[in-house]
C-alpha cells in the first residue's frame, strides 16, 4: 500500500495536542513545527485523520519540497515533482493557497501562477498531451515557503476540519470548533466531571465536550475532497472507517455539561447547534448571567470564551465583567477555570494569577489561554 508523508496544520501553540491525537491514532510523527505536525501514513490514515482528529485544520499529502529564491527556480522545482502520481489527466488542479515566511518569493498570486504553469508543463511531458480538460475531480494544492524552502501538498480535506457540520447558526465572534476541542484537551476535564460554560455563545465548548464524552468523531458526518480520488483512496475505505466511527459513539453516556448565556436568543441558537451535532440531550442549556454563577457540586470546570471587547464601547465594560468572573470563580473554591481571551488585563481585572498563561494565535489574533487548575477530587474508595 502506498505510503504518504502527511501534514496536519493546526493553531499556533497547540501542536502538542495534535501530536498526541495523531500518536493515539497509531501513526508515527515525523516532525513538529510551528502550526503543523507531519506524520507517516497510508490511504487509510488519510481517512482516519480527517474523520477522527479534533484539533487539526486539514490533512495534506506532501508532494515534495525544494529550495527556490527566484521564480525560475520555483518553476523548475515545481516541474520536478511527481504530480502525475497523484493527479489524473482529467483532474482539476490549482494552487488554492500560497503562504510565504522569511522567503525571497512572497507574492501569493505570482507563486500560484508560476507553479500552475510548471505543473501543466510536467503533466504535458509525462502524458504526451497538449491540453487538459480539467473537468474531473478537484485537486487543490497548498504551498508553504519557509526560508526559501518550498513545500507543496495536496489538500485532502477541502472545507476546513473545524467545519463539523453542526454549526449552521453562529453568535457573535464564535470560537473555531477545532480550537475549542484542542483547548478542552489541554485541560484535565473528563466526562465524569461537571463542565460549565457561562458565555456559551454558539455552544462550541459544550458541544465539543459532549462530542468527546460520547466519543463522536468530529468528521463522521461531513464529506472530504479526497473522497473523489478513488485512484488514491478506495471508496470502501471511507465507508469502513465511517462505520467504525459510528459504532464507537456512545450517545447514552452520562455526563454533566451546562451551557449558559445572558441572551435567550443565543441560548436557543446554541441548543439548535447541539441538536444538529446529536448531543442536545447531553447539555443543560439555560439563560443565566455570569453574576448568578454558582453550583452545589464540587470539583467542576469552567471552560469559556468570555467577551473581549471588539468595539471601543465594549472595552469599557471589560474590567467590571472580568471582575465578576473572578468573584464567582473564587466562590467555587474546589473548581478549575480555563478561559481564552484577547483581553490582556484579564488577570488584573479578575484579581487572580493564572498558574499558566499560554499564548495562542486564533488566526491573526493573539489570544491568551488562562489556566486556573483547582484541587483534584479525592479518589473513590
Feature locations, PLM:
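C-terminal catalytic and target-recognition region of SAM-dependent MTase-like enzymes
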Residues: 289-381
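Conserved S-adenosyl-L-methionine
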Residues: 175-294, 310-311, 317
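Flexible, glycine-/basic-rich loop-and-beta segments that form/coincide
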Residues: 48-55, 159-164, 168, 374-381
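C-terminal edge-of-domain segments
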Residues: 141-157, 370, 376
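SAM-dependent Rossmann-like transferase core, predominantly class I methyltransferases
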Residues: 152-186
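A short, flexible beta-alpha/helix-coil linker loop
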Residues: 100-103, 160, 307-311
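Non-catalytic nucleic-acid substrate-recognition regions in nucleic-acid-modifying enzymes
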Residues: 2-139, 381
Amino acid at each position: 500500500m502506498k505510503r504518504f508523508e502527511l501534514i496536519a496544520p493546526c493553531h499556533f501553540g497547540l501542536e502538542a495536542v495534535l501530536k498526541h491525537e495523531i500518536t493515539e491514532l497509531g501513526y508515527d510523527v515525523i516532525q513538529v513545527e510551528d502550526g503543523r505536525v507531519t506524520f507517516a501514513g497510508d490511504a487509510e490514515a488519510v481517512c482516519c485523520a480527517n474523520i477522527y482528529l479534533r484539533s487539526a485544520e486539514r490533512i495534506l499529502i506532501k508532494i515534495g519540497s525544494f529550495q527556490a529564491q527566484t521564480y525560475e527556480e520555483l518553476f523548475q522545482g515545481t516541474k520536478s515533482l511527481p504530480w502525475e502520481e497523484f493527479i489524473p489527466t482529467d483532474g482539476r488542479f490549482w494552487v488554492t493557497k500560497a503562504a510565504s515566511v522569511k522567503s525571497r518569493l512572497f507574492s501569493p498570486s505570482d507563486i500560484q501562477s508560476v507553479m500552475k504553469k510548471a505543473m501543466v508543463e510536467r503533466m504535458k511531458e509525462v502524458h504526451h498531451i497538449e491540453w487538459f480538460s480539467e473537468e474531473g475531480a478537484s485537486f487543490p494544492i497548498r504551498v508553504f515557503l519557509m526560508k526559501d524552502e518550498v513545500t507543496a501538498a495536496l489538500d485532502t480535506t477541502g472545507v476546513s476540519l473545524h467545519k463539523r457540520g453542526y454549526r449552521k447558526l453562529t453568535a457573535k465572534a464564535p470560537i473555531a470548533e477545532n480550537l475549542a476541542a484542542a483547548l478542552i484537551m489541554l485541560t484535565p476535564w473528563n466526562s465524569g466531571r461537571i463542565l460549565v460554560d457561562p458565555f456559551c455563545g454558539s455552544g462550541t465548548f459544550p458541544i465539543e465536550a459532549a462530542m468527546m464524552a460520547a466519543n463522536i468523531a468530529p468528521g463522521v458526518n461531513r464529506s472530504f475532497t479526497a473522497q473523489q480520488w478513488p485512484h488514491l483512496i478506495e471508496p470502501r475505505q471511507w465507508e469502513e472507517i465511517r462505520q467504525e466511527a459510528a459504532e464507537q459513539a456512545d450517545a447514552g453516556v452520562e455526563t454533566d455539561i451546562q451551557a449558559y448565556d445572558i441572551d435567550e436568543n443565543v441560548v436557543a441558537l446554541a441548543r439548535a447547534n447541539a441538536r444538529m451535532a446529536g448531543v442536545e440531550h447531553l447539555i443543560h442549556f439555560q439563560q443565566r448571567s455570569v453574576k448568578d454563577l454558582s453550583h452545589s457540586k464540587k470539583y467542576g470546570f469552567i471552560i469559556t470564551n468570555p467577551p473581549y471587547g471588539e468595539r471601543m464601547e465594549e472595552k469599557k465594560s471589560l474590567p467590571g465583567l472580568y471582575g465578576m468572573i473572578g468573584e464567582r470563580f473564587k466562590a467555587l473554591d474546589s473548581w478549575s477555570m480555563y478561559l481564552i481571551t484577547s483581553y490582556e488585563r484579564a488577570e488584573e481585572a479578575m484579581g487572580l494569577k493564572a498558574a499558566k498563561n499560554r499564548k495562542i494565535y486564533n488566526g491573526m489574533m493573539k489570544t491568551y489561554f488562562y489556566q486556573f487548575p483547582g484541587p483534584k477530587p479525592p479518589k473513590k474508595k
